Amino acid sequence: MAEKSILEAVKKVLEESPKRNFSESVDLAINLKNLDMNLPKNRVDEEVILPHGLGKELKIGVFAKGDVGLRAKAAGAAYVISDVELDELASDKTRARTLANECDLFIAETQFMPTIGKNLGIVLGPRGKMPIPLLPNKDIGELIQSKQNAIRLRSKDKLTFHVPVGRRTMSPDDLAENVEIIVSRLERVLDKGRHNLRTVYVTTTMGKSERVV
């Protein structure tokens, strides 16, 4: 169970934010301090597995062919991009950008990685969506399932950044535990732990925000 202060903050946000006619995202607004973000070592770039996921199915794109591609589709991949389609995307940047925006993340067989970097790096890189390599000893189905509960903490060179922690339809307890996992990870990876956290607020898409750190 999450610590009481985090749970109370989540409950307050959910109770005091007007209900919308769509499923709102619940996010964290993270503000860092006392860090020179021009130095790559101070930038946050961490994958976190949320104990309760995001309350929605992530759209995962997989660059693969043959049996791996078939198994990726069976495991729930939103898109399976073959080597032929990859070549087509290289010459159609509009289509490549559309695909990049529609997918939450990408996975690729290792033999695809050099071509992806060369032809799609300019599209995927700035979005933080360069593919996760599928290593030869890794099962594509298991990897897809594990990534359904994964998020990326990515500050780039900014002191302030946002990250989703779930949907408003989730229980306060589940959301609070997701928040606690993220705060704990930040405390672990930041140079001075919590002393590098100026504030952390939990908020809904269009509603109230409440401080948790």
From Swiss-Prot:
- A molecular-function term among this protein's GO annotations: tRNA binding
Q: Which UniProt keywords apply?
A: Repressor, Ribonucleoprotein, Ribosomal protein, RNA-binding, rRNA-binding, Translation regulation, tRNA-binding
Pfam families referenced in this protein's UniProt entry, alphabetically: Ribosomal_L1
Q: Which GO terms describe its biological process?
A: regulation of translation; translation
Question: Entry's PROSITE patterns?
Answer: RIBOSOMAL_L1
Q: Name one GO cellular component term.
A: large ribosomal subunit
Quaternary context: Part of the 50S ribosomal subunit.
* Family indicated by similarity: Belongs to the universal ribosomal protein uL1 family.
Q: Which HAMAP family match?
A: Ribosomal_uL1_A
- Role description: Binds directly to 23S rRNA. Probably involved in E site tRNA release.
Q: What is this protein called?
A: Large ribosomal subunit protein uL1
**Annotated source species:** Methanosarcina barkeri (strain Fusaro / DSM 804)
The gene is rpl1
